[in-house]
Design a protein with these regions (language model features):
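Conserved active-site segment immediately N-terminal to the catalytic lysine
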Residues: 218, 238-257, 276-280
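Active-site phosphate-binding strand-loop segment of PLP-dependent enzymes
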Residues: 153, 157-223, 386
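Conserved PLP-binding catalytic core of the aspartate aminotransferase-like
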Residues: 314-321, 328-363, 373, 377-378, ...
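Conserved PLP-anchoring active-site segment centered on the Schiff-base-forming lysine
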Residues: 120-139
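PLP-dependent enzyme catalytic core of the Aspartate aminotransferase-like
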Residues: 65, 69, 73, 100, ...
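PLP-dependent aminotransferase class I/II
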Residues: 254, 260-327, 332-335
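Conserved N-terminal alpha-helix of the aminotransferase class I/II PLP-enzyme fold
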Residues: 65, 69-112
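N-terminal "arm"/small-domain region of PLP-dependent enzymes with the aminotransferase-like
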Residues: 9-76, 219
Length: 411
């Protein structure tokens, strides 16, 4: 336990010396109505290139109207957990619409993606089980596996051969998979978990290969598609649609409402038995207040717009290609991502911070991502695009990056 103030001060000083101390920037206002990409920070209006508002829906008037009208009927707070008195018509309708959108029997709302992952993995695994995870997975998947008590094994990022080696080694070690599980879920399992789109690199998981791997080794597969749903796939149904993976081959699908859909919260989609079981066993669902009904109402509006307005995804894809082409022409070495997440890996944390500050001085908000969020030596700018960005802002960002990168290379 670290409650000694001097010890805490020394650790904070160490973070400072390593250029890894985290600080918050204060967003003061959004000065252009309906435009989520212009934000005032420190008295300066910046173009935001580090949010996850991929479709530009967070300020959409239909979301604001839906939330406002709902508040006139339900008030603001839910007042209770879903299983007491907090489950409103808006929550229930949103769950049904999310289930239909993802092609599942049912969906279950959680207060955040972090809580969804903790709730699902904690409910389905225990110390008798194994969680096999991509090394680049989101921190919530890693924490969920650790807290569940299951044996956590991590394969090299995107490396299906390594993942299979781990499963074969488990079998060769004589682990039969039989147990008497305290959570009542039956025999021991291996749960394979992966991001759909990896949040720091922007690459897409090899979901089709993972489904084949899971079937060969009789494992369950869980995909957290927080950065894929609403963004990729012909109709916005995410990584599974893009990769052609069958929904029945991925029995556990996690999604978020706080990115493409422009609101807040998360959900798990699956068959009726899975959702009913999570209602009984997922502690992060049972023991917390439900999302405000107004958030659910706004989420329904965001989901409808994401489903119907295909031009938003098309616009986002066009801007992504535009930015990558401009960066390539200026010799800015972006990572190999085809999604709106465009990483520029610079390696050194101090340089990442300096580059972020230089961009802010030029009118762009791009956060520096440093260890331990990313591996040592891979500090980066995590540039994210939105359908709400203007062509001229994307071009100006690329031009500014090109200038800064040339200065770095010449130093």
């Amino acid at each position: 336990m670290r409650l000694d103030s001097q010890l805490l001060a020394r650790e904070l000083a160490a973070f400072e010396a390593q250029h890894t101390r985290r600080r918050r920037q204060l967003a003061e206002a959004f000065p252009e109505p309906g435009d989520p990409t212009a934000v005032r920070v420190g008295g300066q209006v910046l173009r935001n290139f580090c949010s996850n508002d991929y479709l530009g829906l967070s300020h959409h008037p239909e979301l604001i109207r839906a939330a406002t009208e709902c508040m006139s009927r339900f008030g603001f707070g839910a007042g209770s957990a879903h299983l007491v008195s907090g489950h409103s018509h808006e929550h229930h309708a949103l769950e049904e619409e999310l289930a239909a959108f993802t092609g599942r029997e049912r969906a279950l709302l959680f207060s955040s993606g972090y809580m969804a992952n903790l709730g699902v993995i904690g409910a389905l695994t225990d110390r008798h089980d194994q969680v096999l995870a991509d090394r680049a997975n989101h921190a919530s998947l890693l924490d969920a596996a650790r807290l569940s008590g299951a044996r956590l094994r991590r394969y090299a990022h995107g490396d299906m051969a390594h993942a299979e080696q781990m499963l074969l080694a488990q079998r060769a070690g004589g682990e039969t998979g039989e147990s008497h599980k305290s959570n009542g879920a039956g025999t021991a399992t291996t749960l394979i978990v992966t991001d759909g789109v990896f949040s720091m690199d922007g690459d897409v998981a090899p979901v089709s290969a993972l489904t084949a791997l899971a079937q060969r080794h009789h494992c369950a597969l869980m995909v957290d598609d927080a950065h894929g749903l609403g963004v990729i796939g012909a109709s916005g149904r995410g990584t599974l649609e893009l990769t052609g993976a069958a929904s029945q081959a991925v029995p556990i699908l996690v999604g978020t409402l706080g990115k493409a859909f422009g609101t807040f919260g998360a959900f798990v989609a699956g068959d009726a038995a899975l959702i009913d079981y999570l209602i009984q066993r997922a502690r992060t669902y049972i023991y917390t207040t439900a999302l405000p009904p107004a958030v659910a109402a706004a989420s329904r509006a965001g989901l409808r717009l994401a489903r119907e307005e295909h031009w938003r995804r098309e616009r986002l894809h066009t801007l992504t290609l535009r930015f990558r082409a401009a960066a390539a022409a200026l010799a800015v070495p972006l990572g190999a991502s085809t999604t709106p997440i465009q990483p520029l890996i610079v390696g050194d944390s101090a340089w990442a911070l300096a580059l972020s500050e230089a961009l802010m001085n030029a009118g762009f908000w791009v956060a520096a991502i440093r260890p331990p969020t990313v591996p040592a030596g891979t500090a980066r700018l995590r540039i994210t695009l939105s359908a709400a960005h203007r062509d001229q802002d994307v071009d100006a960002l690329a031009d500014t990056l090109g200038k800064l990168w040339r200065e770095k290379s010449a130093a």
